[in-house]
Amino acid sequence: MPHSTPSTRSDIAVIGAGIVGVCVALKLQEQGRQVLLIDRDHPGAATSFGNAGLIERSSVFPYAFPRDWSTLIAYALQKKTAAHYHWKALASLMPWLVGYWRHSSPHLYPAAIAGALPLIENSWTEHAPLIEAAGVSRLVNQNGWIKVWRHQDTEQASLDQAKQSLAYGLSVKVLSNSELQIKEPGLDPALIGGVHYPDSRQIHDPQALTTAYLNLFLQRGGRFIRGDAQSLQRDGQRWQVTTDEGPHSADAAVVALGPWGEDLAQKLGYQLKMGRKRGYHMHFAARGTAPTHVIVDVDNGYALAPMQQGIRLTTGAEFALRDAPPTPVQLDRIEPIARTLYSLGARLDQQAWMGSRPCTIDMLPVLGPAPKHPGLWFCFGHAHHGLTQAAASARLLAEMICGRETFADPKPYRVDRF
């Protein structure tokens, strides 16, 4: 881990060194600000570590809460592998779930699409120069991802969404069974078809990307110190946080704590109505040829992603308390299904990895100034798209902090919208 020269003062302290926080630090640095990055752990070691690695330019439709009763009943009875829930967590999750369901309605869902669009459209264009400057172009898979299915009803819904994607300028290629076999020879020949989304990129090692961004930040004069995010407090006209090198104060502070952001926000008096979708992954050896695209099994709600560590199987959503003990039920249910989809070898990890996706009721991040606290800014709540939206969110926040003209309207992400 690179270290930096200790200091007790800076222009801005960024609290949280996941992919979002590191991007915020870099974008503020590009605006000429002196930035200190603070985290209790190794950068990128928590939520940012375990995703499928997609920088998802084609994901213009946020993950909505199901509306049809048959799907809802199947989820309630734990019949679908795409989701799992803890009974004991439902009472505390209910306000968020109800809000999430309401914002997924035909009346409100278009606002979620419109709000997310600037961050999605600029996802790759904001990441690309950072990747080049950090010298890690080797981590980028340019092949995009493929959605596959086995059932006719799933096929129609997937084709309808692919057609709708064309209105947003996306490249979409519908694949027959034989075309699927050409693109990915290791796939189950019984699949009906698929859709290829080539505009997205995939990172073969998301934590390596975060570490490379951190190194770039340090090379450009930034500083990283381990510290306690929950110690952040107002100190006169400045913000102070306790670090391993003593108290540090800054003119402004950015909270970029992912699923822990709401804890600090609540401590400061903000009610953000957030929930968490936990997810799991496991790496597998390749038996023969490894996939060259991320493959999403839309029928069963999981993805297979080619990684430096092996083939990463990522699960859908688990609705549970963030800090409850891991229950990798979905992973155990999905593995036999995934083995019929693609030829997987042995498990490579001793235990399943688990992370939490921070989710708002309206499927948009919390991004902007904390209205009751001058000099305090929030940037978290990116749900399934933390990696995707990190660099664009960071640019927007840096423009706001530095008083620049913003590339997008920040109103949909404001802190006081709930």
Could you tell me what each predicted segment is?
Residues 21-22:
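N-terminal Rossmann-fold NAD(P) dinucleotide-binding loop
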Residues 30-49:
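Glycine-rich FAD pyrophosphate-binding loop
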Residues 6-18:
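Beta1/beta-strand and adjacent pyrophosphate-binding region of the FAD-binding site
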